[in-house]
Amino acid sequence: MTRYEMAQIVAKAMAKGANVDRLAAEFADELDSLGVRVAALEKKSDNVKITGQVRFSYKDADASKGIKEGDTGRLRTRIFVKGSVNEDWTYTGRFENNQYTNNNVGDDDVKLNWAFVSGRVGGIKMDAGRMDFTNAGGTVLDSRGDGVKLSYGDKIKVHGWALKGSDDLAKANGTFEHFMNDGDRVYVAGVGGQLGIVDAAVNYYKADMLADTEIYEVAAGVKLAKDLKLNGAYYHGDLKDSDLDKNGYLVGLTYAGAKAAKVGSWGLYANYSERPASTYLVPTALSGYATAPYTNVYDADGYKGFEVGANYTLAKNIVAGIKYFDLEAREGNEDAKTLWSEVVFTF
């Protein structure tokens, strides 16, 4: 094709474009009305977003005599529904089903275990309903509850929570439960933010689980290199009418981390902690991953030990992970070692 022939094609396209422009000017009002209707339809079609997650996990525990080890394979399916209420408010729901390999019955129950609204009241962000409550890595609290979250700020955020345990919470391993149960109440206040290479948080917890408990948490993370981070936390707790130790700590390293959208990405982490029973409520480590290394949390006065883990993105939206826990009671000679493995699919 010669340049002249190409120029003729361009000239015809420009002429048609000019005709379209003239027609658009002539029917501007009608097109505007049509545009409003089309935009409204597009907005309506995007009003609800549905996503999902499927996780297959296996837990293998080796614990002292008398401790329920909890070895099991589990297939957990979650469907998330997020809808727009208006320009300022959204609704989020989560349906969950669990299938276990260590029983011979069908696990057909599907539970709606998230149901909350999110929005702003003035400059304050608010979430209200049934949802997960966790912060600062979940080393004190990582549980589901019915309540409200309030937060204010950008780089430095102040937050307050009030919640009670929902009726579908799992029980702790062992004969003495140290997890949140239906109706247990927890109140949290804190401040946190990012200051250069350091992120820090200070939190206060007040709970009526087992007995009245007050916990102060100071946590910080320092970026040592591009993907390497040093984490640490100090805890001071007071469990009413007990003479348990009051001070605990955690120190750890984190390197990078698997990203579901980036094939081949990976990460490693390692933590060591010493946690008297007065310094935690429902930590992430004991909320289903590791077997608690005691039969009675008071006699054991909590736990100490280390946790290591790794994750790797096998394919887009498919991430494999492994965790190993070696924990022992702070008092007595009970212990528990747990190997947790999982593959997570998101869609």
What are these regions (language model features)?
Residues 1-55:
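N-terminal periplasmic/intermembrane-space "pro-region" immediately following the signal or transit peptide
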